[in-house]
Regions:
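Short beta-strand micro-motifs in enzyme catalytic cores
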Residues: 41-43, 75, 147-153
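Conserved beta-hairpin
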Residues: 39-56
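C-terminal "cap" of GNAT-fold acetyltransferases
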Residues: 140-160
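Conserved acyl-donor/pantetheine-binding loop and adjacent beta-alpha core of acyl/acetyltransferases
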Residues: 53-81
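Conserved GNAT acetyl-CoA-binding A-motif
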Residues: 105-119
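Conserved acetyl-CoA-binding loop-helix of GNAT-fold acetyltransferases
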Residues: 84, 90-103, 132
Length: 160
């Protein structure tokens, strides 16, 4: 079942985030609360077994990936992070969250979903997931101030 993220889910989210921190930005209780306060979409599935946090293009959230996307596209929903607990992977939870996120975007007339996936360190499973679910590569970017490189993806939902 998909529902809102509540403070009771924070501990599990922080634990999952830490497991995958090589692909995700680190989080604390405070930074998670701030992230959720600014997020357009913040849902969990199966009592926190998975989460998806996303932003509209005009959300009050400053981040280098969102900044890059704002310079490339006019109107979009951005997937900031999706995390599925190790024990729940392979059960279709990410797909269910993405489908729900897509419904939310369509209900607001948003023409595309966008995200980035690490290429350094490479997150091969995430690349495969996004391609399988209709996302197309946009561009590979290496940030000079970081050890991380990403590939941006987009999925068209509506004509602009």
């Amino acid at each position: 079942m998909i529902g809102e993220i509540k403070t009771q889910h924070f501990k599990k989210i922080l634990t999952m985030n830490e497991k995958f921190v090589h692909w995700l930005a680190p989080l604390t209780n405070e930074s998670l609360a701030t992230l959720l306060d600014k997020a357009t979409y913040k849902k969990q599935i199966n009592n926190g077994a998975g989460v998806l946090i996303g932003f509209s293009n005009n959300a009050d959230y400053e981040h280098k990936n969102l900044y890059w996307l704002r310079n490339k596209f006019n109107k979009f929903f951005y997937i900031d992070r999706v995390i599925i607990d190790t024990h729940s992977q392979g059960q279709g939870l990410a797909k269910k969250l993405y489908d729900d996120f897509t419904k939310e975007a369509l209900s607001q007339g948003i023409p595309r979903l966008v995200c980035e996936v690490n290429t350094k360190p490479n997150n091969e499973a995430s690349h495969k997931f996004h391609i399988k679910n209709g996302f197309k590569p946009v561009e590979d970017v290496h940030y000079k101030d970081s050890k991380i490189s990403v590939r941006y993806y987009e999925k068209f939902l509506l004509d602009d």
